[in-house]
């Protein structure tokens, strides 16, 4: 989930330093609001510090625990197999638009019991802030959030929005703004990041089919492969913190933002041997793609289970493919071999 902030005055880099900063919420606070050009509310529980952060996290955790998500695997698998079959019926298609995005949205439809919304979510494209034009705008998302909030308050449907609308935090039912903040993260947090993960997997296997063959011969490597793809692709490369909590004062210096570089931790040579190589035999893999500390991603189990189903379906399909077109924006030095954004990726069956 990409969040827009003004430029950071400094950036914390390196695995050890990043982990220490993410633990130190008093010095590096999440009490800030990103995307101020398109929203006027906090994304929750992302943009609030402990102890209130913990209250939101405890209330939301039951929706994301691993046993609950594992019950949905058969539906994830059915969607994955159908989309793969349909995708490879064509000579060459764009992966993000025709495979990764639809699959991620269908999975979210299952998780949230909102299959009726999947086509609308897909229509937003990879970034909801640019759903209607290249200019960032919040109207599309906010129309949807306002509509589902009004619907949820009627308790007419048994879905996740009806439950979220009546959550209590510290003994009080959440407000409309809090609902926006929670639901917005739930729609965005597992959207562009997982789309990038799936697209990156297809890109890698298209360029290195021997790695797909390795997994077919050694399915016990699927778990390590998931963690290695998460590390290498680093779907969310950085986030900001603030050294001046924004709700505590009206005097907010322009240089209050500090960048936290997850990608620097994931390619730290003191932790990962040959970090610029994808290695499914890598043992310990303490990557930072889900963050670290109190704000560790709530949806990490969802992403891992989705990726496991995706890889298992690819392995069982017997398919192989090659990249026919790639328009990729890579990161700046020293990460110039690491995709930042897949503008277009077309593949063809071999």
Regions of interest found by a model, annotated:
Residues 1-350:
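Cytochrome P450
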